[in-house]
Amino acid sequence: VSSNDAHTVTVNGQQIAAEPVVADTLSIVDLAKYPPQVAATIDVPGSVVGPPYAVAVAPDESFSIVSSATKLDSADPKKIVPDDRVSVIDLAGGPKVVQQVTAGAGATSVDISPNGSLVLVANRTEGTVSAFRLNNKKLEPLDKVDLGNPKAGPSGLAFVSDRVALVSRDGDNMINVLRIDGNTITVDPRPLTTGVRPYTLAVAASGNLAAVSNMGRGDDDIDTVSLIDVSSEPFRTVETISVGMSPEGLRFSPDGKFLAVGTQEGTTKKNGSPFQTPNGRLAMYAVDGKSLRKVAEAPVGHWSQGIAFSKNGETIIVQNMVERTLAVFRFDGQKLTAGTPIAIGAGPAALGTAWR
């Protein structure tokens, strides 16, 4: 499921409101066949702001949950302001929006607990995490967890188990462990440290490893990705490697043997910047125990966002926000082979699949 932002564009390194004003969309992409195909597209609020994990898909593919971190100001459509909307989309009979609730300002990464009973949303602008009970494809507000700093910038969020989740804080450079006990959610007093501006979070299907992109200060230096050992407590950062500039896209293969990392490189820099580049990059890393080893890479488009694997791990798509396309690759464990990009009517900004 691809959430597509139609209200935000980048011009000469600056994010501005798109003209003319059109609706954000959500596209259903069939990854079971090659080449992948867009099966349906409907209007659903979405945003490029925040990690590209603002989409969660039920394991049975019957519904999806999409958050929206920004929107156009109703009083001034040339201004982009924080949003708090979270939409539930029925995928089995439509697709169609069946519910819309509010989380917190800057609602971004969203995840469903493994047992399907709890949904968490990181509220990037206000420094909180919203919790919802999930019953019959309906969200019921449960709690809002204050992280203690309104500028914490909670960004990436992922469940490790039904009782534990991780949330990255790119505003103050740490990762919190959230403890879940029934209806009570608390912040573990010991944060994790990975790097400067920890952002996108992913957890392997095995539940033993998590990965986080460290976006850095945005000063055109090489940035990093870290691995966190979550196989036993206390959790601990065990690997950090240099990957390139602005590693926003991040996802484990379904079998956990590879980590895909999308770096934007200099594709969002101002014209004339010595760091401007014509392409971003997709890199594939083999997961060797608790370390990473690069095995393949290929160019992608400008301002790349989410990454998704087909269930068998052989097809990979990458969102190109500026080109409004999905880059398509085949991966055999050793090399990436590019296919024909898929056109998307709005800027593809976040991706979710029914599998990790």
Predicted feature locations:
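Predominantly soluble domains enriched in secretory-pathway, periplasmic, or organellar proteins
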Residues: 1-356
